[in-house]
């Protein structure tokens, strides 16, 4: 099992110890690009054409609600493959 597959499994299990960089890696794999203000905010927005943007605070560990949001994206992307 590759490291990426392990990350996907952690997301599907709603792991409480997910880190921002791990979620970023998964979202970027599915074509989302990260943007944020030049300074002053810890929140980063991930965008993909034709999809709703998702905003995630860059704090660790990531709260469960944000992991759930990424889980929905992963499941949606897997259905479309």
List PLM regions with ranges.
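C-terminal structural segments of small proteins and small subunits
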Residues: 59-81
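Generic anion/oxyanion-binding catalytic loop in active/binding sites
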Residues: 12, 56-59
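A short, structured beta-strand/loop element
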Residues: 29-54
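Basic helix-extension-helix modules of the SAP/HeH family
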Residues: 5-6, 41, 52-55, 73-78
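Polyanion-binding surface elements
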Residues: 11-31
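Solvent-exposed, charged helical/coil patches
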Residues: 1-11
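Residues that form or flank phosphate/diphosphate-binding pockets in enzymes
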Residues: 18, 41, 65
């Amino acid at each position: 099992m590759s490291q990426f597959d392990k990350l996907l499994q952690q997301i599907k299990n709603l792991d409480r110890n997910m880190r921002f960089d791990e979620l970023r890696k998964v979202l970027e794999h599915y074509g989302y690009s990260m943007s944020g203000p030049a300074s002053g905010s810890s929140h980063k927005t991930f965008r993909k054409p034709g999809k709703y943007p998702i905003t995630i605070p860059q704090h660790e560990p990531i709260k469960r609600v944000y992991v759930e949001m990424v889980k929905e994206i992963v499941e949606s992307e897997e259905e479309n493959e």
